[in-house]
């Protein structure tokens, strides 16, 4: 596939880009189209047909809305930033070998790697859930605006991520508008999946380094209960992770092998 003009990791960190509700089934369909060996043009046409009656407004939906939805799906699974190609390829391989109910883990990882804004929103959601057991769209919008600026696009993107997480079953609406509680939670025990998810998160932080213990307790990974493993196990399970220590029990991970 051609990758000319793709965003580098540096540029995408300042961008928002996530301006639409993205349903889990749409990501699954997109990944399956890539796994089946379709070229970019065929995938684009297939997504146009697939989304024809699935966006709000049905056949009357504005073309721009569908185009933006497809652009998000393509950036995650079809044409990711060039530094995420290996991550994407490994993610597709893992999808083909793990149970369907665990696919959500891989879709989460690729989404946050392609859209660091998603991870920033998830971090504030996770923090609120830990502190008070609920999370508020308004509170997260205010926190994110402090980081990305007071822009309408920021508030809209936060809202769309909340709606997406609710669609994925990871948040549940309450009787109070804009207030959510935790939804589904997933235990991750497969070392391949853990290593891949750690790598995805390191891409959010421009390759690391990050302390291993901190990664396992990240609020931005709030839907997942990651089985603690050693840095050595992660490095062995990954083609691209590397580790170093600065003291007893202070292991750091970095994307440091051939990428």
What are these regions (language model features)?
Residues 50, 67, 71-76, 158-168, ...:
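Basic amphipathic alpha-helical segments that dock to polyanions
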Residues 122-133, 137-185:
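Eukaryote-skewed repeat-based solenoidal scaffolds used as protein-protein interaction platforms
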Residues 174-254:
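Accessory, usually C-terminal, subdomains that scaffold auxiliary metal cofactors
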Residues 42-48, 131-146, 206-219:
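Short acidic, hydrophobic short linear motifs in intrinsically disordered regions
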Residues 2-112, 123-124, 135:
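Eukaryotic partner-binding/assembly regions in large regulatory complexes
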Residues 26-34, 38, 108-134, 189-210, ...:
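Positively charged, polyanion-binding regions of nucleic-acid-associated proteins
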Residues 53-61, 142-153, 214-228:
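Short helix-coil junctions and helix-kink-helix linkers
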Residues 40, 62-67, 84, 118, ...:
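Alpha-helix N-cap/helix-initiation sites
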């Amino acid at each position: 596939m051609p990758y000319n003009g793709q965003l580098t990791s540096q540029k995408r960190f300042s961008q928002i880009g996530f301006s639409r509700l993205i349903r889990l089934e749409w990501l699954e369909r997109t990944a399956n189209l890539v796994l089946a060996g379709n070229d970019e043009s065929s995938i684009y046409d297939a997504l146009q047909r697939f989304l024809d009656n699935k966006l709000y407004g049905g056949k009357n939906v504005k073309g721009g809305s569908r185009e933006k939805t497809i652009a998000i799906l393509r950036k995650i699974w079809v044409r990711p930033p060039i530094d995420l190609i290996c991550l994407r390829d490994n993610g597709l391989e893992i999808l083909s070998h793990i149970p369907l109910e665990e696919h959500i883990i891989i879709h989460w990882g690729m989404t946050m790697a392609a859209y660091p804004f998603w991870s920033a929103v998830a971090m504030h959601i996770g923090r609120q859930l830990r502190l008070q057991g609920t999370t508020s769209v308004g509170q997260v919008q205010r926190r994110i605006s402090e980081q990305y600026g007071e822009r309408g696009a920021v508030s809209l993107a936060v809202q769309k991520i909340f709606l997406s997480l609710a669609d994925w079953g990871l948040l549940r609406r309450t009787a109070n508008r804009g207030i959510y509680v935790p939804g589904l939670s997933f235990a991750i025990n497969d070392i391949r999946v853990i290593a891949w998810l750690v790598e995805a998160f390191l891409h959010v932080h421009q390759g690391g380094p990050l302390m291993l213990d901190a990664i396992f307790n990240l609020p931005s990974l709030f839907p997942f209960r990651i089985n603690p493993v050693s840095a050595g196990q992660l490095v062995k399970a990954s083609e691209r992770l590397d580790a170093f220590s600065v003291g007893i029990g202070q292991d750091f991970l970095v994307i440091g092998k051939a990428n």
